């Protein structure tokens, strides 16, 4: 029998064999119901009618949290309910009643709760029960200025485990996407009728060059984009679409590669611009020919920038003054800095060099610290607190940071050519993008591929096409996770003392 016909039985009071009284202490509701439908739809009533004397009763009284919402749960046995459009408090109260009656219900985890009701919200979640969904809901609604000392340690640890503080940004020449690691799905996509080149994303802002040498900023929150013109005094800057973009949110500044025509040809520059005034601040690097790719490593807090053109130069970010230079004539140079910005590593993709190597330098003075005997070419390097990670097209190499010894080599020949690797801060996973648009996940403890190692399904591949680039990015829970970690660290220090 359809739900529509069940509804006719209920609304017309046909063939009812039981009066059900729902009482929350303030309001009492009496319903004419059918035991067979209660039994079929509720584990609570199954247990009652199988094991207790109520199976013989014509009237049953039950104490509930909320009589009106409990009534809606019972009515859902007869006709379709529309809970998803209700306010946050109703949805939570409905979930509490479905749990009581043993009725399957999927809670909308995107519920938004007003700041002033957060404590009430947490109390209701406690009645529903803690799981990944409800803990995620709490983290999503947690105010940044909330007193975390109200929560016990195991609860805060549960909040961290239930969610990640990063997402994955992927792009190709006409589109870009955001993949939620927590939800295991794409949560944002944008298609653009222009051919897009190098991009940079910071939280909600995405900066990209287009085929028309213009810079576009996309805002994820508003789902809108705008073109940006930048100037050197009154002269409009022409961008190098094959170059680099590096956005500095703390200063609202952006570093770009651009082209300046001269009487002898062109100067290819890398410069800092203010997005407030749209004006050039300073130029870090200039060359008058298409040469080696310019590589950037930047830390505003450490006041350093590393650029590579004809050689590697370490400069003060604030002044542009060169601190020291390292001769590096090979092509395909890659650079990575340690998390504390005390050292940096230089590797090369040059196949003509007989003895491939990774060299570690001191960032304070440019002195050579260590040379790693690396026999294969290198496309890129990452430096985490635990490993220096290098890769070429087929292999990934893990060197320990405490002794610079090779501890693992992962062969990816059977998975496709490696395009890029990335790891968010010191997270437990390294992500690998291959040329067939497959994304693999490596556990940083075991240094093995995980079982869930491909986020790009065949359907996704058909709809989207090949990805050109990806990056792990902060998500909306990043700052909250940092505050929770800080609170837990303070408690551990207090426990030790």
Swiss-Prot record:
InterPro entries: BTB/POZ_dom (IPR000210), Quinoprotein_ADH-like_sf (IPR011047), SKP1/BTB/POZ_sf (IPR011333), WD40/YVTN_repeat-like_dom_sf (IPR015943). It comes from the Viruses. It holds the Pfam family BTB. Residues 16-86 form the BTB domain. PROSITE patterns: BTB. Belongs to the mimivirus BTB/WD family. This is Putative BTB/POZ domain-containing protein R738. The lineage of its organism: Viruses, Varidnaviria, Bamfordvirae, Nucleocytoviricota, Megaviricetes.
């Amino acid at each position: 029998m359809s739900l529509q016909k069940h509804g006719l039985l209920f609304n017309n009071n046909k063939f009812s064999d039981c009066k059900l009284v729902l009482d929350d202490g303030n309001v009492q509701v009496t319903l004419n119901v059918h035991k067979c439908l209660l039994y079929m739809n509720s584990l609570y009533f199954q247990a009652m009618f199988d094991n207790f004397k109520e199976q013989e009763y014509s009237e049953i009284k039950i104490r509930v949290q909320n009589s009106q919402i409990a009534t809606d749960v019972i009515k859902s046995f007869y006709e379709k309910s529309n809970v998803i459009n209700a306010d946050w408090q109703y949805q939570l109260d409905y979930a509490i009643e479905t749990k009581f009656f043993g009725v399957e219900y999927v809670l909308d985890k995107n519920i938004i709760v007003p700041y002033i009701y957060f404590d009430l919200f947490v109390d209701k979640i406690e009645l529903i029960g803690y799981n990944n969904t409800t803990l995620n809901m709490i983290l999503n609604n947690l105010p940044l200025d909330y007193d975390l000392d109200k929560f016990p340690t195991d609860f805060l640890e549960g909040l961290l485990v239930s969610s990640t503080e990063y997402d994955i940004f992927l792009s190709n020449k006409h589109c870009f996407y955001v993949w939620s690691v927590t939800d295991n799905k794409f949560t944002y996509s944008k298609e653009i009728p222009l051919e897009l080149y190098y991009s940079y994303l910071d939280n909600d802002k995405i900066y990209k060059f287009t085929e028309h040498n213009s810079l576009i900023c996309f805002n994820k929150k508003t789902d809108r984009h705008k073109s940006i013109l930048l100037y050197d005094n009154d002269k409009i800057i022409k961008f190098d679409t094959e170059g680099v973009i590096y956005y500095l949110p703390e200063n609202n500044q952006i570093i770009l590669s651009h082209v300046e025509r001269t009487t002898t040809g062109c100067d290819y520059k890398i410069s800092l611009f203010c997005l407030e005034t749209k004006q050039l601040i300073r130029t870090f690097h200039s060359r008058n020919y298409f040469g080696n790719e310019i590589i950037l490593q930047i830390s505003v807090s450490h006041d350093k920038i590393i650029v590579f053109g004809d050689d590697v130069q370490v400069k003060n970010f604030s002044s542009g003054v060169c601190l020291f230079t390292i001769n590096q004539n090979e092509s395909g140079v890659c650079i990575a800095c340690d998390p504390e910005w005390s050292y940096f590593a230089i590797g090369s993709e040059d196949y003509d060099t007989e003895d491939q190597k990774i060299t570690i330098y001191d960032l304070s003075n440019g002195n050579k610290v260590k040379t790693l005997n690396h026999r294969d070419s290198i496309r890129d390097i990452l430096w985490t607190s635990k490993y220096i990670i290098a890769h070429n097209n087929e292999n990934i190499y893990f060197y320990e940071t405490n002794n610079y010894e090779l501890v693992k080599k992962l062969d990816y020949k059977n998975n496709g050519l490696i395009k890029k690797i990335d790891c968010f801060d010191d997270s437990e996973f390294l992500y690998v993008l291959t040329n067939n648009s497959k994304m693999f996940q490596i556990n940083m403890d075991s240094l093995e591929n995980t079982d869930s190692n491909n986020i790009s399904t065949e359907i996704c591949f058909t709809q989207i096409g090949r990805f050109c680039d990806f990056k792990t990015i902060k998500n909306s829970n990043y700052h909250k996770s940092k505050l929770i970690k800080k609170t837990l660290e303070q408690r551990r220090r207090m426990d030790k003392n």
